[in-house]
């Protein structure tokens, strides 16, 4: 199951990238991923909090950074890094900043889900996560 969203942002690719990899600042602008512990380096283990509903934050443990490329402006992480849990449901979350013009980018934000429960959870997750990712995209654009 894949969830994929896009938004055009009137900013340079470099500026959008700087916001994405500034994990300590997520709580000040991101309404969905409200906190990230760790650094944006390949192989680094991160954990983060997501806002599941008003007043409800869910901790997501032990995701591994797979790609963190300033050159291609791509950030990906996969989790959870718990072997039994990843057989049931695992997601590869991604952000890609595509330069369209000097001060205009396409921000691609999505997640590929795999595991035994991925298909069964699609009706529950598809619309909710698409809405959440679009909410984050709009907040990034406003930043």
What residue spans do the PLM features occupy?
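Hydrophobic ligand-binding cavity/cleft-lining segments
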Residues: 1-41
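Hydrophobic/aromatic beta-strand elements that line small-molecule binding cavities or substrate pockets
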Residues: 5-7, 61-68, 91-99
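Solvent-exposed residues in well-ordered beta-strands and their adjoining turns
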Residues: 8-12, 49-51, 98-100, 110-114, ...
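Short strand-connecting beta-turns/loops that link adjacent beta-strands
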Residues: 12, 41, 70-72, 100-103
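Short solvent-exposed loop/turn micro-motifs enriched in small/polar/acidic residues
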Residues: 29-31, 58-59, 88-90
């Amino acid at each position: 199951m894949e969830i994929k969203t896009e938004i055009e942002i009137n900013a340079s690719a470099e500026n959008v990238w700087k916001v994405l990899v500034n994990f300590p600042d997520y709580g000040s602008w991101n309404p969905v991923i409200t906190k990230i512990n760790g650094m944006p380096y390949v192989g680094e283990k991160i954990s983060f909090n997501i806002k599941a509903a008003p007043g409800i934050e869910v901790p997501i443990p032990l995701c591994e950074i797979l790609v963190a490329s300033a050159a291609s402006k791509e950030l990906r992480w996969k989790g959870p890094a718990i072997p039994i849990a990843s057989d049931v449901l695992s997601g590869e979350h991604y952000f890609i900043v595509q330069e369209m013009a000097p001060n205009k980018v396409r921000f691609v934000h999505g997640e590929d889900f795999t595991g035994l429960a991925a298909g069964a959870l699609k009706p529950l997750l598809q619309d909710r996560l698409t809405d959440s990712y679009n909410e984050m995209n709009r907040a990034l654009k406003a930043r």
